[in-house]
């Protein structure tokens, strides 16, 4: 393999495959192509999640594969044919078989949106907010057979603002920082300077997927806990309660600690831009709501649609 001379070190071109999906996978691929990295293949899902990567790979003359599952036999065959030296996981929701990890000669690296070993698992951003963390970040780590357990290559921190949601934290910070971090990680590997720092398992946390099993609002809880749950579930899956046998999801939350003599879940006010709901230790203010599988709507439209009035209570059927 040809070596490219640089003033202070030798940089070896690396054959790279990228496994990913969505805007993040596409942006990582785009960033590496702009740096003229030797991307020899991409793998993305066959549905719309993989369209962006597929289109960019096709435009760039790169082999692209769209398997149903990464454990499909043809994926391993493609890996072997491509002879990658490095595999990059850029937003992967499928399980990567251990067999694939043995193919790239330098290994496989993965982006994870938390400061590992804290918040291992598929919905780390949600849980950082739900748990009330004030700082988080992202980790790029060397993949092993565990779930987010491999040695750390690179970490960057970011502050969680008091009004951040999962959406704002990801799109305004962790997404762009993660793309830059992947580029930096590849450069470190090329220079032979990429560390492999073992994770401290004694500090590890692992949470289940943030879905409707954990997204139900309990208005009996302290105001901060309710506030963090709604922020952490915004935009997905949407923290919810019930009203007249309908599932109501909350977005655009604010909190106002105070002493208030109202029942938990009681509607305090309905205004053009907000609904205020009593909780333990104050009121929370909701800017957008969604009924069952409908669209997000404003407070007044919502109240009319379900015949909600001041004094009614959420969470009572």
Predicted regions and their residues:
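One-carbon transfer enzymes
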Residues: 3-237, 269, 282-285, 291, ...
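C-terminal active-site/capping subdomain that shapes the small-molecule cofactor and substrate pocket
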Residues: 227-317
């Amino acid at each position: 393999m040809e070596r490219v001379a640089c003033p202070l070190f030798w940089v070896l071109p690396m054959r790279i495959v990228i496994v990913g999906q969505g805007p993040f996978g596409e942006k990582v691929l785009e960033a590496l192509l702009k740096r003229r990295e030797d991307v020899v293949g991409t793998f993305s899902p066959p549905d719309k999640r993989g369209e962006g990567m597929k289109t960019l790979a096709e435009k760039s003359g790169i082999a692209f594969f769209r398997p149903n599952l990464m454990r499909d036999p043809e994926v391993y065959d493609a890996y072997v044919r491509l002879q990658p030296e490095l595999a990059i996981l850029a937003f992967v929701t499928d399980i990567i078989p251990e067999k694939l990890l043995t193919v790239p000669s330098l290994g496989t690296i993965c982006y994870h949106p938390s400061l590992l070993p804290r918040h291992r698992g598929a919905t780390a951003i949600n849980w950082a907010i739900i748990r009330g963390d004030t700082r988080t970040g992202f980790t790029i780590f060397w993949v092993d057979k565990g779930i987010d357990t491999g040695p750390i290559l690179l970490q960057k921190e970011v502050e969680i603002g008091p009004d951040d949601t999962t959406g704002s934290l990801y799109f305004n910070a962790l997404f762009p920082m993660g793309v830059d971090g992947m580029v930096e990680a590849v450069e470190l590997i090329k220079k032979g300077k990429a560390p492999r720092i073992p994770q401290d398992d004694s500090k590890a946390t692992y949470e289940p997927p943030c879905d409707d099993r954990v997204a139900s609002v309990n208005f009996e809880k302290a105001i901060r806990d309710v506030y963090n749950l709604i922020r952490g579930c915004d935009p997905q899956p949407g923290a919810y309660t019930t009203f007249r046998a309908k599932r109501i999801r909350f977005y655009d939350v604010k909190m106002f600690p105070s002493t208030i003599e109202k029942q938990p879940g009681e509607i305090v006010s309905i205004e053009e831009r907000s609904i205020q709901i009593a909780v333990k230790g104050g009121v929370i203010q909701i800017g957008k709501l969604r009924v069952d599988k409908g669209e997000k709507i404003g407070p007044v439209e919502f109240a009319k649609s379900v015949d909600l009035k001041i004094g009614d209570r959420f969470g009572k059927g």
